[in-house]
Protein backbone atom coordinates (compact mmCIF):
# COMPACT_ATOMS: atom_id res chain seq x y z
CA UNK A 1 0.00 0.00 0.00
CA UNK A 2 2.75 2.46 0.93
CA UNK A 3 4.61 1.70 -2.27
CA UNK A 4 1.49 2.56 -4.29
CA UNK A 5 1.12 5.82 -2.35
CA UNK A 6 4.77 6.66 -3.07
CA UNK A 7 4.49 5.91 -6.78
CA UNK A 8 1.31 8.00 -7.19
CA UNK A 9 2.82 10.87 -5.16
CA UNK A 10 6.05 10.87 -7.16
CA UNK A 11 4.12 10.95 -10.44
CA UNK A 12 1.92 13.80 -9.17
CA UNK A 13 4.99 15.69 -8.00
CA UNK A 14 6.65 15.26 -11.40
CA UNK A 15 3.53 16.51 -13.16
CA UNK A 16 3.08 19.51 -10.86
CA UNK A 17 6.62 20.73 -10.20
CA UNK A 18 6.84 22.88 -13.34
CA UNK A 19 3.16 23.86 -13.32
CA UNK A 20 2.68 24.82 -9.68
CA UNK A 21 6.27 25.58 -8.72
CA UNK A 22 8.77 24.24 -6.26
CA UNK A 23 7.97 26.52 -3.33
CA UNK A 24 4.18 25.89 -3.23
CA UNK A 25 4.75 22.13 -3.45
CA UNK A 26 7.32 22.23 -0.64
CA UNK A 27 4.94 24.30 1.47
CA UNK A 28 2.07 21.89 0.79
CA UNK A 29 4.35 18.96 1.60
CA UNK A 30 5.51 20.52 4.87
CA UNK A 31 1.96 21.35 5.97
CA UNK A 32 0.75 17.86 5.07
CA UNK A 33 3.66 16.17 6.85
CA UNK A 34 3.11 18.38 9.91
CA UNK A 35 -0.60 17.48 10.01
CA UNK A 36 0.12 13.76 9.56
CA UNK A 37 2.75 13.78 12.31
CA UNK A 38 0.48 15.68 14.72
CA UNK A 39 -2.35 13.21 14.12
CA UNK A 40 0.02 10.28 14.59
CA UNK A 41 1.48 11.78 17.78
CA UNK A 42 -1.97 12.36 19.26
CA UNK A 43 -3.06 8.82 18.37
CA UNK A 44 0.07 7.26 19.86
CA UNK A 45 -0.11 9.38 23.01
CA UNK A 46 -3.82 8.79 23.66
CA UNK A 47 -4.25 5.16 22.54
CA UNK A 48 -4.64 2.50 25.21
CA UNK A 49 -1.27 1.02 26.14
CA UNK A 50 -0.37 -2.66 26.10
CA UNK A 51 2.54 -4.27 27.95
CA UNK A 52 5.50 -5.41 25.84
CA UNK A 53 7.42 -8.67 26.34
CA UNK A 54 10.74 -6.88 26.92
CA UNK A 55 9.17 -4.41 29.35
CA UNK A 56 7.52 -1.08 28.77
CA UNK A 57 4.31 -0.38 26.91
CA UNK A 58 3.21 0.42 23.38
CA UNK A 59 0.04 1.88 21.87
CA UNK A 60 -2.63 -0.77 21.32
CA UNK A 61 -4.11 0.28 17.99
CA UNK A 62 -5.85 -3.08 17.61
CA UNK A 63 -8.18 -2.21 20.50
CA UNK A 64 -9.75 0.60 18.46
CA UNK A 65 -10.20 0.04 14.74
CA UNK A 66 -10.78 3.78 14.25
CA UNK A 67 -7.39 4.64 15.79
CA UNK A 68 -5.69 2.06 13.59
CA UNK A 69 -7.35 3.40 10.44
CA UNK A 70 -6.52 7.01 11.37
CA UNK A 71 -2.89 6.05 12.03
CA UNK A 72 -2.71 4.29 8.65
CA UNK A 73 -4.25 7.28 6.84
CA UNK A 74 -1.81 9.64 8.60
CA UNK A 75 1.11 7.39 7.63
CA UNK A 76 -0.04 7.32 3.99
CA UNK A 77 -0.44 11.12 4.02
CA UNK A 78 3.06 11.57 5.41
CA UNK A 79 4.67 9.14 2.96
CA UNK A 80 2.78 10.63 0.02
CA UNK A 81 3.54 14.21 1.01
CA UNK A 82 7.25 13.50 1.37
CA UNK A 83 7.49 11.35 -1.78
CA UNK A 84 5.75 13.94 -3.95
CA UNK A 85 7.41 17.05 -2.56
CA UNK A 86 10.50 17.12 -0.35
CA UNK A 87 11.92 13.81 -1.58
CA UNK A 88 12.44 14.75 -5.24
CA UNK A 89 11.96 18.53 -5.26
CA UNK A 90 14.78 19.18 -2.83
CA UNK A 91 17.22 17.76 -5.39
CA UNK A 92 15.77 19.94 -8.15
CA UNK A 93 15.78 23.03 -5.97
CA UNK A 94 19.34 22.78 -4.69
CA UNK A 95 20.58 22.67 -8.26
CA UNK A 96 18.61 25.82 -9.11
CA UNK A 97 18.53 28.07 -6.08
CA UNK A 98 22.15 29.08 -5.67
CA UNK A 99 23.91 31.78 -7.68
CA UNK A 100 26.58 30.66 -10.15
CA UNK A 101 29.46 31.93 -8.01
CA UNK A 102 28.64 29.43 -5.26
CA UNK A 103 26.49 26.78 -6.92
CA UNK A 104 29.02 23.93 -6.78
CA UNK A 105 29.98 24.33 -3.13
CA UNK A 106 26.46 25.21 -1.95
CA UNK A 107 24.92 22.25 -3.76
CA UNK A 108 27.47 19.94 -2.15
CA UNK A 109 26.78 21.35 1.32
CA UNK A 110 22.99 21.19 0.83
CA UNK A 111 23.19 17.59 -0.39
CA UNK A 112 25.39 16.71 2.58
CA UNK A 113 22.93 18.31 4.99
CA UNK A 114 20.10 16.33 3.40
CA UNK A 115 21.98 13.05 3.78
CA UNK A 116 23.03 13.94 7.34
CA UNK A 117 19.40 14.72 8.20
CA UNK A 118 18.24 11.38 6.82
CA UNK A 119 21.00 9.65 8.78
CA UNK A 120 19.98 11.48 11.97
CA UNK A 121 16.35 10.40 11.59
CA UNK A 122 17.37 6.81 10.86
CA UNK A 123 19.70 6.77 13.86
CA UNK A 124 17.43 8.52 16.37
CA UNK A 125 14.01 7.08 15.51
CA UNK A 126 14.49 3.63 17.13
CA UNK A 127 16.00 5.15 20.27
CA UNK A 128 13.30 7.81 20.61
CA UNK A 129 10.51 5.37 19.73
CA UNK A 130 11.66 2.97 22.46
CA UNK A 131 11.37 5.86 24.91
CA UNK A 132 7.97 7.17 23.66
CA UNK A 133 6.59 6.68 20.18
CA UNK A 134 4.01 9.44 20.62
CA UNK A 135 6.59 11.95 21.80
CA UNK A 136 8.87 10.92 18.93
CA UNK A 137 6.18 11.82 16.40
CA UNK A 138 5.56 15.08 18.27
CA UNK A 139 9.26 15.98 17.98
CA UNK A 140 9.20 15.23 14.26
CA UNK A 141 6.00 17.31 13.95
CA UNK A 142 7.89 20.27 15.44
CA UNK A 143 10.63 19.74 12.86
CA UNK A 144 7.97 19.68 10.10
CA UNK A 145 6.57 22.93 11.51
CA UNK A 146 10.06 24.41 11.28
CA UNK A 147 10.19 23.32 7.62
CA UNK A 148 7.01 25.35 6.96
CA UNK A 149 8.68 28.44 8.40
CA UNK A 150 11.87 27.66 6.48
CA UNK A 151 10.00 27.52 3.16
CA UNK A 152 8.01 30.67 3.93
CA UNK A 153 11.03 32.72 4.97
CA UNK A 154 14.01 31.40 3.02
CA UNK A 155 13.12 29.35 -0.05
CA UNK A 156 12.86 31.29 -3.32
CA UNK A 157 10.67 30.11 -6.17
CA UNK A 158 12.85 28.95 -9.05
CA UNK A 159 10.13 27.91 -11.50
CA UNK A 160 10.66 29.45 -14.95
CA UNK A 161 13.93 31.10 -13.91
CA UNK A 162 17.22 30.79 -15.74
CA UNK A 163 20.12 29.69 -13.55
CA UNK A 164 21.81 33.03 -14.21
CA UNK A 165 18.82 34.88 -12.70
CA UNK A 166 19.66 33.38 -9.30
CA UNK A 167 22.57 35.84 -9.08
CA UNK A 168 20.06 38.72 -9.13
CA UNK A 169 17.77 37.01 -6.62
CA UNK A 170 20.67 36.25 -4.28
CA UNK A 171 21.73 39.91 -4.37
CA UNK A 172 18.16 41.19 -3.78
CA UNK A 173 16.67 41.74 -0.32
CA UNK A 174 15.20 38.55 1.18
CA UNK A 175 11.58 39.67 0.81
CA UNK A 176 11.86 40.13 -2.96
CA UNK A 177 13.53 36.73 -3.38
CA UNK A 178 10.33 34.94 -2.41
CA UNK A 179 7.94 35.32 -5.31
Regions found by a protein language model. Name each.
Residues 1-179:
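Alpha-helical transmembrane bundle of multi-pass membrane proteins
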Amino acid sequence: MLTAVKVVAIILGMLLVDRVGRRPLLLWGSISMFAALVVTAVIMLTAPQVAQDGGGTAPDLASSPLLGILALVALCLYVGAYAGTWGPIMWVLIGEMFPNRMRGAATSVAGGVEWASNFAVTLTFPVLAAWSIGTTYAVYAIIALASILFVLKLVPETKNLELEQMDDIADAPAASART
